[in-house]
């Protein structure tokens, strides 16, 4: 399946009540966010690495069996454990 980091990031942000307008800092340019890549399992890793910060979360790429998507954690200590990222 073809996607962009913008689509993947927006989906993760929406889950936490955020949007792209909440970004404080990003290691990716807007052009890089819009590059299409194949995020299917057993495909070649194609998405570029990134880190994005908002007031409340930090967003980053996650991979499992070469499937790629966006994950995030709280920017500040919240007492909630982080589940294993990238696998079942």
Where are these predicted regions, by residue range?
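Acidic interaction surfaces
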Residues: 1-88
């Amino acid at each position: 399946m073809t996607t962009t980091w913008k689509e993947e990031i927006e989906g993760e942000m929406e889950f936490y009540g955020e949007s792209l307008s909440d970004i404080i800092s990003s290691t990716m340019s807007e052009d890089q966010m819009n590059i299409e890549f194949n995020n299917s399992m057993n495909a070649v890793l194609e998405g570029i690495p990134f880190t994005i910060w908002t007031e409340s979360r930090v967003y980053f790429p996650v991979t499992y069996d070469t499937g790629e998507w966006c994950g995030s954690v709280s920017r500040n200590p919240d007492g909630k454990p982080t589940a294993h990222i990238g696998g079942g």
